[in-house]
Swiss-Prot record:
Pfam families: DASH_Dad1. The keyword Transmembrane helix does not apply. One of its GO terms (cellular component) is mitotic spindle. GO terms for biological process: attachment of spindle microtubules to kinetochore; cell division; mitotic sister chromatid biorientation; protein transport along microtubule to mitotic spindle pole body. Component of the DASH complex consisting of ASK1, DAD1, DAD2, DAD3, DAD4, DAM1, DUO1, HSK3, SPC19 and SPC34, with a stoichiometry of one copy of each subunit per complex. Multiple DASH complexes oligomerize to form a ring that encircles spindle microtubules and organizes the rod-like NDC80 complexes of the outer kinetochore. DASH complex oligomerization strengthens microtubule attachments. On cytoplasmic microtubules, DASH complexes appear to form patches instead of rings. Component of the DASH complex that connects microtubules with kinetochores and couples microtubule depolymerisation to chromosome movement; it is involved in retrieving kinetochores to the spindle poles before their re-orientation on the spindle in early mitosis and allows microtubule depolymerization to pull chromosomes apart and resist detachment during anaphase. It comes from Yarrowia lipolytica (strain CLIB 122 / E 150). This is DASH complex subunit DAD1. The keyword Nucleus applies. PANTHER family: DASH COMPLEX SUBUNIT DAD1. Keywords: Cell cycle, Cell division, Centromere, Chromosome, Chromosome partition, Cytoplasm, Cytoskeleton, Kinetochore, Microtubule, Mitosis, Nucleus.
């Protein structure tokens, strides 16, 4: 075997074909990066929505507690707050 056939030194493709293949590789790598970033964004948004729903539940619970406590309080003429003991 000749050494030239084992290790070809010149590419048989044209300059256009080599450049096209390089651009396709670059575009493919960029699209993969975009996909990975979109997946990370999606996970972040899902996490944010989950936290938002939990905070709404917590806010509703505190609102209910505040309204329940407020029903039993009465403001006196001098501005003090007292518990209304007349309700049963």
């Amino acid at each position: 075997m000749s050494r030239v056939s084992m290790f070809p030194t010149e590419d048989k493709r044209s300059y256009f074909e080599r450049q096209r293949d390089q651009y396709i590789k670059n575009i493919s790598a960029s699209m993969e990066d975009v996909l990975n970033n979109l997946n990370a964004l999606n996970r972040s948004l899902e996490h944010t929505v989950g936290l938002s729903q939990k905070s709404e539940e917590l806010a509703e619970m505190w609102s209910h507690f505040y309204n329940t406590v407020n029903e039993d309080l009465v403001k006196t003429e001098d501005g003090d707050i007292e518990v209304d003991t007349t309700k049963e």
